[in-house]
Amino acid sequence: MNKKTLMVCGLIGLSLSLQAQTKNGGIDKQMMQKIVAGHSSASNRALSNAIATNSIDNLARNFRKAGGLDTHFSVETTKQNIHDQKSSGRCWLFSGMNVLRSNFARMHKDTLHVEFSHVYLSFHDQLEKSNLMLQGVIDNAKKPMNDPIVQFFFKNPITDGGTFCGVADLVDKYGLVPMEAMPESYSAENTSRMASIISSKLREYGLELRKMVANKKSAAAIKARKTEMLGDIYNILVLSLGEPVKTFQYAFKDKNGNNVGKPQTYTPETFRDAVLGKKLNGSFIMAMNDPRREYYKTYEVEYDRHTYDGHNWKYINLPMEDIAKMAIASLKDDTKMYSSYDVGKQLDLKRGYLDLDNFDYATLFGTKFPMNKAERISTF
């Protein structure tokens, strides 16, 4: 049997397979009749007209939640300026900086305030994540392209999201600088295009590194080429975010914004030591509520970190009741508690308010959404 015969046989087999799939699993006419039955009522037509010309959220908004919000809190922490992450995924970094500057104000009995540069750590975060991706590709280069770990690196080479573990690793490694020393840039506040460009380069570089491993290039040659690649990424970051400062002059300020003492010369490392007085790693724990897994045990997510030589996302799994007690105790101690949520669900953007009953999508569409938290996490 020649190649042409094999190809014809293959096409016939594929055709028969597709016919079988359509017959058994496709939407046939009889099924379509059942699907569309009962959807032409007057009430459905009215809803269709409304939904076609209005925002789904506006129509599903729960009017019972439209009253004024009670902004009184029985326990409050030291007040600070509010910072806006704009169109970026750096909520983890902004929250982490909020905790650090709150701790600084508390250490000085609210007599001194400081504002940290977000873009300084964002720069190093993106460079470190680029190295994490490239080194991860090297480490797994002998695995096929369809291996889950290899796909993990190539599918999302870099993001600007993260956890407090990333804050700790970056601050401990690169220090801190005040906002005045390195202000936000356009690409820091609008990260999507820069991330897309860097991701494209990382995919290109990842394939090249896999070829180098396949061609049995030496470890030294591979490391040298990776270093050149990171130099290109560094250049993109410098042009987009600005070059990280090495030294700067700074005078601390009181809560009214007035300088306290004369400006002094700092490096990012000496400034970090001045405001924190200690390394962050080893000074905190991460708690998580994941009802899929056994409580009161510690879990670690491999490669879910910001730096190759840093710490994975590691957490103790606790019931929400325990986490709530920890949060209250932290607030009573005037210590802000870093926390993260899936704010894409039931968030009223206009009011800045999260509530499970903000929007009633089930009633609007005549259906139910019965999945519990464990099921939602398992299937996202």
Residue ranges, per PLM feature:
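Alpha-helix boundary/interfacial micro-motifs
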Residues: 14-16, 20, 106, 141-142, ...
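Helix N-terminus capping/helix-initiation residues
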Residues: 28, 55, 117, 266-267, ...
